[in-house]
A protein has these predicted regions:
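Alpha-helix initiation and N-capping motif
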Residues: 52, 156, 319-323
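Aromatic-lined, polymer-binding surfaces characteristic
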Residues: 53-287, 292
């Protein structure tokens, strides 16, 4: 009898070990699949051999570039040292992508490793927290994941310790959360740690919810998107956010991570796109009242990426025709969903015809009208004070902002003095009265100036 019990126990132990091994193999399979998909997405980029040749020639033996300042701590949006990582990204893509002369180049590999090693040792500082938490890690993670399997695991783990999982920081919300979560996902892939990948994916999925309180950052019930207090940011942060969500929906499709994006979350995201972003743009242009300080950037008016809509055609097949029509509209076809909508959480009204766009933006005590941060949008004070956006071609405001009279923004009533448009920090509304009504076809918007 004792012998039978011993045999039974040994059998149970063997079964447990076998099951554990299968779970481990499945986990590694998922890690490899996710890693492969991420790498494949980076290798879609084109390689400019002349650019790579320039970087390879310039890189010094210690892994630094002679034209970059790694020492000076800059404030705001200036971070010259960050170009180091962007160059390494391009070099790593060239190394991994077949069909160019740098593919599998041993010399280029050594240079990329030297560049990563230099950054790991020196760790250039910035006066802007964003570069430390998000900007630099986002660029650093790409060459590192592209070198997985090309350098020793020991080296890979050593360099990946630079990447930190910051998803536990509750201060990272909306777009900032998807940024830090992407770093965690890459770290998990690099280190063969499926738990980190789960944490990152779950963190991204957690942003797909309605945030009801005014001041909470993220998706609003009216289809608008807020970032930086109760501020309309469907463009800028919001456009980058929807790019991220559509990308990760595609990335996890058919994997163990797909269930984190429940149907409820997908429905919320689809409403954000169809009932929000689609209505705030016209052809290739996004409403300048919904892009915050991005109005000061060269590509600030860019509308949603066609690639994002292509991802959604595959992940929301019931509305594939709607995404296709939207994509055609970006290239000049008639707008597919004409009408009027008032975004009551964001104090903006839009009116669409098949061949025109009109919007008016106001402010109230419930909203933060716009912002000046990092020396961007220095003259944006009047932007939420009745500004009217009128588009028929979609190119009316292309390149105009550097020479605009910011005291005469269409639709506004402003003091005609050079300093009256100057903005410092956030612009908070002081008027309680402000809002609009809409029946879906026509609407009225007003506010107390």
């Amino acid at each position: 009898m004792k012998r039978l019990k011993l045999i039974f126990c040994l059998l149970c132990l063997c079964c447990s070990l076998t099951e554990a091994k299968e779970v481990q193999v499945d986990a590694q399979k998922e890690v490899d699949e996710m890693t492969g998909r991420l790498v494949a997405s980076y290798l879609e980029a084109k390689v400019d051999e002349d650019v790579i040749a320039g970087y390879a020639t310039a890189l010094r033996s210690d892994g630094s570039f002679p034209d970059l300042d790694y020492v000076t701590v800059h404030e705001g949006s200036s971070y010259p040292a960050g170009s180091h990582l962007k160059r390494l990204k391009l070099m790593a893509i060239a190394y991994r992508k077949p069909g160019n002369k740098y593919y599998n180049s041993g010399r280029l590999l050594k240079q990329i490793v030297a560049g990563i090693d230099y950054w790991y040792r020196v760790r250039p500082k910035s006066g802007n927290w964003w570069f430390g938490d998000i900007g630099a890690p986002q660029d650093y993670m790409v060459p590192l994941i592209l070198l997985k399997g090309k350098i020793s695991d020991k080296k890979l783990l050593h360099y990946s310790s630079y990447l930190q999982d910051l998803t536990g920081n509750k201060g990272h919300k909306g777009k900032n959360r998807t940024w830090v979560s992407a770093v965690t996902i890459h770290k998990g892939c690099i280190e063969n740690n499926i738990e980190l990948i789960r944490i990152g994916i779950k963190s991204i999925a957690s942003t797909i919810k309605i945030v009801p309180e005014q001041g909470d950052e993220g998706i609003k019930v009216d289809g608008s998107f807020h970032q930086h207090r109760p501020q309309l940011y469907s463009g800028g942060y919001g456009l980058s956010y929807v790019d991220d969500i559509a990308y990760y929906l595609q990335l996890v499709k058919g994997t163990a991570f797909e269930p984190y994006f429940t149907q409820e979350k997908k429905d919320i995201f689809i409403n954000l796109l169809m009932g929000g972003h689609r209505l705030l743009g016209y052809r290739e242009t996004f409403d300048f009242g919904a892009i915050g300080r991005n109005i000061s950037r060269p590509e600030g008016l860019s509308n949603i990426s066609p690639v994002t809509l292509e991802y959604m055609e595959q992940n929301d097949s019931d509305r594939a025709a709607d995404y296709s029509a939207w994509k055609k509209h970006l290239s000049g076809a008639p707008f597919p969903a004409p009408g009027n909508k008032y975004f009551w959480k964001s104090d903006i009204m839009v009116q669409h015809g098949t061949g025109y766009y009109l919007s008016a933006k106001v402010i109230s005590t419930r909203t933060n009208g716009t912002e000046m941060l990092n020396n961007e949008n220095l003259k944006g004070y009047n932007l939420p004070l009745g500004a009217t956006n009128i588009l028929t071609s979609g190119k009316e405001y292309e390149g105009i902002f550097p020479v605009w009279n910011w005291n005469k923004i269409p639709g506004t009533t402003a003091v005609q003095h050079p300093d009256s448009a100057r903005l410092e920090g956030y612009l908070f509304g002081r008027n309680r009265f402000g809002g609009g009504v809409s029946n879906g076809k026509n609407g009225v918007i007003a506010y107390e100036h």
